[in-house]
């Protein structure tokens, strides 16, 4: 370009000749740019295809169709677990090591511990999202690894922080908890979960389309998830407490809905707030994939161990002001 400009300035070539040359060069290089972009997209597609193939090749969890537990106590018996597997088929890095505790029917068992301690993994193993690599998880005396996951999950209601909404109405999203539920049953569950308050502001009420993952606030999404669980009315509830990120009004609404959901159930809650922990019947403190201590909140506070230290730190941070 600089040489061409110099030649035009010196009169050696005409400006239109220079312009035609530049136009021709741009036309020649355009297909190369497109080819490079296409190659980049092909590499990205290949990477995605590999991930999809790995998912499709993952063996399906199998088990019997009979599930007749005696009660709904959830027992972890010397459980170990590691994500992934190496070429030799052995599990990857251990996330849980020799974890043993019992979540009693009719009680709230709170799992507490620092990030990465294994709380979420325990909740997922309880519902057989994965199988333990050592030890066993039982429900009412039945080893969950022997039960078909679809059959097992009929006895579970799951309320995790990442609430999935679908391209459907509010009522349709709540009905996912139990597909054969009547409209009256869906509305009753929604009212019990305090959904009426925000649904009333929608143009078509419970018939409003909310779209895939929707535009609802965190508290509103959480209440829809609780309504699903109330509608299902399963004897075991797995709850990943999400109130830490909610405003005061939404937190109050969610807590009221949870109190209705948890009554009389076997509850395993991944706890983040001390108010939840203090109201639990049992606390299991996890650290580095092991049970550091367990007992009632009062017992653990009196013992002055890991749990007492965590409570003191949270109370100290709550009292801190700018």
Residue ranges and their predicted role:
Residues 18-29:
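Small-residue-enriched core segments of transmembrane alpha-helices in multipass membrane transport
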Residues 69-322:
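ABC-type nucleotide-binding domain
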Residues 28-55:
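Cytosolic ends of transmembrane helices, especially the final helix of ABC transmembrane type-1 domains
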Residues 61-64:
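Active-site phosphate-binding and catalytic loops of NTP-dependent enzymes
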Residues 2-6, 50, 241:
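Transmembrane alpha-helix boundary and packing residues in multipass membrane permease domains
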Residues 1, 37, 41-44, 80-91:
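An intracellular "coupling" helix at the cytosolic face of ABC transporter transmembrane type-1 domains
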Residues 1-19:
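A hydrophobic transmembrane-helix motif
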């Amino acid at each position: 370009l600089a040489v061409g400009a110099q030649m035009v300035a010196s009169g050696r070539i005409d400006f239109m000749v220079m312009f035609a040359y530049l136009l021709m060069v741009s036309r020649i290089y355009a297909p190369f740019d497109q080819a490079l972009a296409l190659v980049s997209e092909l590499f990205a597609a290949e990477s995605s295809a590999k991930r999809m193939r790995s998912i499709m090749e993952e063996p399906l969890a199998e088990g019997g169709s009979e599930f007749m537990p005696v009660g709904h106590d959830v027992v972890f018996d010397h459980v170990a677990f590691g994500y992934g597997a190496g070429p030799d088929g052995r599990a990857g890095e251990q996330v849980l090591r020799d974890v043993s505790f019992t979540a009693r029917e009719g009680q709230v068992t709170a799992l507490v511990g620092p990030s990465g301690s294994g709380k979420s993994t325990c909740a997922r193993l309880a519902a057989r999202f994965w199988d333990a690599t050592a030890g066993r998880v039982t429900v009412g005396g039945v080893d969950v690894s022997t039960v078909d996951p679809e059959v097992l999950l009929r006895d579970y209601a799951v309320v995790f922080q990442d609430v999935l909404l679908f391209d459907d109405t509010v009522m349709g999203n709540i009905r996912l908890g139990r597909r054969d539920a009547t409209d009256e049953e869906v509305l009753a569950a929604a009212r019990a979960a305090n959904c009426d308050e925000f649904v009333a502001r929608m143009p078509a009420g419970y018939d409003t389309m909310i779209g895939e993952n929707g535009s609802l606030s965190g508290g509103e999404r959480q209440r829809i998830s609780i309504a699903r669980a109330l509608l299902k009315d399963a004897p075991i509830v797995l709850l990943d407490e999400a109130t830490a990120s909610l405003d005061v009004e939404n937190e109050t609404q969610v807590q009221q809905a949870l109190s209705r959901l948890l009554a009389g159930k076997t509850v395993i809650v991944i706890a983040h707030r001390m108010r939840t922990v203090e109201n639990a019947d049992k606390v299991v403190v996890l650290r580095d994939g092991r049970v550091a201590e367990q007992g009632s909140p009062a017992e653990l506070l009196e013992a002055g161990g890991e749990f007492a230290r965590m409570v003191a730190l949270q109370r100290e941070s709550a009292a801190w002001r700018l």
